[in-house]
């Protein structure tokens, strides 16, 4: 509770709180995502940061934080998809464990761990496999919340274009979207068919709390193209 209070105070003091009058377009997007997924409206902030990112923090009263670069880089639909993804974390009650996973990801950086007292404890946690298991769970949680975003947007290409901008940065405007999707399918095919490719992909992703953007595109395409997405909609009468 104390930590959650600190998080809220930090962003109230250093970021812009989104309200019906302050950034009303973002507030409207949050309303759409929350109403669709059946989640009580959390507080949302926009923080000055050049990294295209967003995250959800807190537990009992979670907050969503959008980096300013994300709001500037993405169009309205893509921004809604990101907000829906974050609301998906709240709906699925991921926030506590995601916070722990991000902390472990941070501490796994050797240069950071060397500066922190008790780094031997960090090494012990890692050796016990706790870190690997939690980060693996976090990556699956991210994929499940991409599906939450899909349920809000009902258009896999909005998710795909968002991932393209995450992968390509400012260069994304020069990237052919259809070829990017083809790359995602090729990645998934190689991952499924080649043990060596699967090994290297898993090794490279093992220390991260998020799957690679291409991986996320491949997963959302598979979910929609195999009919699983339609089954979820039908089950909920959509």
Description of each model-found segment:
Residues 30, 66, 145, 212:
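Residue-level signature of catalytic and energy-coupling elements of molecular machines
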Residues 74, 83-92, 144, 148:
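Active-site His/Glu-centered metal-binding helix of metallohydrolases
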Residues 87-106, 113-115:
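Catalytic Zn2+-binding segment of zinc metalloproteases
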Residues 21, 65-81, 133-139:
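Short pre-active-site segment immediately N-terminal to the catalytic Zn-binding motif
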Residues 1-57, 131-134, 170-171, 193-201, ...:
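Hydrophobic or amphipathic, alpha-helical segments that drive membrane association/targeting
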Residues 14, 21-27, 33-39, 116-190:
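Short helix/loop segments within enzyme catalytic domains
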Residues 1-8, 147, 151, 155-238:
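Cytosolic-facing loops and C-terminal tails of multi-pass membrane proteins
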